[in-house]
Amino acid sequence: MKSLVLGLLVGSAIASGPLQHVLHAPPEPEPEPEPEPQVVKDPFEELRDTFDRLRNKAGDIWDDVMDNIPNIISNIRPPTIPPKKFTRLPDSEWTHIVRGADLEALWVDDESGYKHRKVDGKLAQYDLRIRAVDPSNLGIDNVKQYSGYLDDNLNDKHLFYWFFESRNDPDGDPVMLWLNGGPGCSSLTGMFFELGPSSITEDIKVKYNPYSWNSNSSIIFLDQPVNVGFSYSSQPVSDTVAAAKDIYALLTLFFTQFPQYSTQDFHIAGESYAGHYIPVIASEIMHHKDRNINLQSVMIGNGLTDPYTQYPLYRPMACGEGGYPNVLDSETCRSMDKALPRCLSMIKSCYDVESTFTCLPASIYCNNALIGPYQSTGRNPYDVRIDCKGNGLCYPQLNYITDYLNQPYVMKSLGVEVDSYESCNMDINRNFLLHGDWMKPYHRLVPYLLAQMPVLIYAGDADFICNWLGNKAWTEALEYPGHTKYAQSPMENLTMVNSEGINEIFGEVKSHSNLTFMRIFKAGHMTPFDTPQASLEFANSWLSGEWSEV
């Protein structure tokens, strides 16, 4: 799943609460203030005090804020995140260990006799630890499974992954990497909540998922960046780019240990803030000429990729122009329209400079002005049709997943080295925000990818936070050689035979010049959760190359 938007009203968010995610519940009512003891000033207190005034008069006072913000931002020091407690398992506990140094030392001759390294990249600092998971221990699926850690020994980073073979034809079916967003949310929530082999029930039992995406593909679920889910590190992570080299190393070492998968088609898929991650990761892979990763396409669901083009569509989606009744009243909608020009000017400054100084203010102002009004209603930001349920992320099922994964026998079966699991790490979310990553223009990498592979952007049409209007708009605005033909292409029906044997229209699609956009009807932010059969239908069609042009 994954994305959150915690704490969009800046005053309280920066100082004490989770900042923005692309997935987040409405803020809890603030308790009555109590007398505070004299303590050392919080490093964010000055920033909080300045931005507190934005709550009701963001537009009127922003010029004053901008007069003061340079010194404030320059003095920001993100909070020190205490490292997770962990117990490193001995090497004897692992089925395989792949040493990056051994792979980096391998040289081969090409047809002309030129000697070069077998695979590109700096790999010596990495090891991949692999454990064969006994399917009968957990009952998640009866297919072959592996779990383990990618270790960056130089930087003390340890990324957890869990691999499931295809239920159909593991020797011939494609392989997929799945990433959730946040930033800071575990991909195991996507696995159990959306598209993995099983879900977790209210009584913390495993329930088989007949619509799992591993029905016709093998899948790696990866907890990244570090300190997300079962991953851990003593080092903080604060931007999208940092993880790309780690993921390249993980895939390279994994396919070295399991060469049978390396020749099969490989795809990267994810949702929400993975709209930032995936263009960077895919570009990193494709920049390595000698690689054992057969990357064929990328898939981004309800993603945040081009804020400048996507943010103008928050008001239409909240105000009844996205195919569902309005959530906000007309006065609030007009106030969002008035705030938009300033928001776009600030995002443009972020795009022009790509610095914390320009990108952080854009995140704060735009999220308060264009997302904050919706957040205050109590409506589910991931599904405009329903109210937010329970605490945290609006879906009680996520608590079931956390309870299941924190059971000692589960952690032991997987070789987990940390002492607990949490679905989303708000410290990471805050760090990404404070370093300006939220508003950066990662869509600029997509044309490079389109020249080499198909790209799918899909969106459940009931989502607010990364809505279909914005995702359709940015694909149509994207500057690449196929822009005109793609933008002019009509939307066509997506159909399937449903479980009752009836031919059903479940969405719309447009595709040209390697770029495809899908609108999935009756689905929210987590499309496979709301429409499991339809999601498996379009995923299988995509993986089979139905819209490929390269």
UniProtKB/Swiss-Prot annotation:
Output the Pfam families linked to this UniProt entry: Peptidase_S10
| Compartments in which it is found | Vacuole
One cellular-component annotation, GO: fungal-type vacuole
According to its UniProt entry, the function of this protein is described as: Vacuolar carboxypeptidase involved in degradation of small peptides. Digests preferentially peptides containing an aliphatic or hydrophobic residue in P1' position, as well as methionine, leucine or phenylalanine in P1 position of ester substrate.
Q: What is the lineage of its organism?
A: Eukaryota, Fungi, Dikarya, Ascomycota, Pezizomycotina
Keyword terms, alphabetized: Carboxypeptidase, Disulfide bond, Glycoprotein, Hydrolase, Protease, Signal, Vacuole, Zymogen
Task: Cite a single GO BP annotation.
Answer: proteolysis
Record-annotated disulphide pairs: 185-424, 319-333, 343-366, 350-359, 388-394
Residues annotated as glycosylated are 216, 493, 514
Which Enzyme Commission number(s) are on file for it? 3.4.16.5
User: What InterPro entries does this protein map onto?
Assistant: AB_hydrolase_fold (IPR029058), Peptidase_S10 (IPR001563), Ser_caboxypep_ser_AS (IPR018202)
Catalytic residues of the enzyme = 272, 463, 525
Q: SUPFAM superfamilies, alphabetically? A: alpha/beta-Hydrolases (SSF53474)
Q: Which chemical reaction does it catalyze? A: Release of a C-terminal amino acid with broad specificity
**Source species, please?**
Paracoccidioides lutzii (strain ATCC MYA-826 / Pb01) (Paracoccidioides brasiliensis)
UniProt lists the family membership as follows: Belongs to the peptidase S10 family.
In this entry the propeptide is located at: 19-131
Q: Is Cell membrane set as a keyword in this record?
A: no
Q: Which GO terms describe its molecular function?
A: serine-type carboxypeptidase activity
Q: State what protein this is by name.
A: Carboxypeptidase Y homolog A
